[in-house]
């Protein structure tokens, strides 16, 4: 009897681990167009809210996760560096210097909530250090 319960428990645990918990966080594909759109929105939001004279660009994506939550929640962990473009200027050709100083590199966790049927993107968390 106990052996059947243990086997059933292990089987359920294995299924949940391999498929993930419904509504739980899962790794996202950085190359997905919706993920890219949310990341661009997150960086634009950061640049709009910061007091930096120059814009920042993502230099490294550390982790991207997504979660179904009345839409899609994207959680980005990224490194951002100061680019060569001042805020308010044309940003199409901004480059990140080859050897940025350590003070110019920040790591951010930015959460974007997407509700495509409402044409809505919203930053719900923005923590940088």
Swiss-Prot record:
Please state where this protein is localized.
Secreted
Coarse class of the primary localization is secreted
Gene3D superfamilies hit by this protein: 3.10.450.10
- Site description Cleavage, residues in chain: 91-92
Q: What span is annotated as the signal peptide, if there is one?
A: 1-18
SUPFAM superfamilies on file = Cystatin/monellin
**Disulphide bonds in the chain:** 85-94, 108-128
Write out the tissue specificity statement of the associated record: Detected in ovary but not in all the other examined tissues.
Concerning PTM, the database record says: Proteolytically processed to produce two chains linked by a disulfide bridge.
- Chain positions of motif Secondary area of contact: 67-71
User: Mind telling me which CDD domains this protein's record contains?
Assistant: CY (cd00042)
A GO cellular component annotation here is: vesicle
Matching entries from PROSITE patterns are given as:
CYSTATIN
The protein's site described by Reactive site is found at 23
From the UniProt record, which GO molecular function terms apply?
cysteine-type endopeptidase inhibitor activity
Entry keyword set: Disulfide bond, Protease inhibitor, Secreted, Signal, Thiol protease inhibitor
Tell me the function of this protein.
Cysteine proteinase inhibitor.
The record's similarity note reads:
Belongs to the cystatin family.
Q: What is this protein called?
A: Cystatin
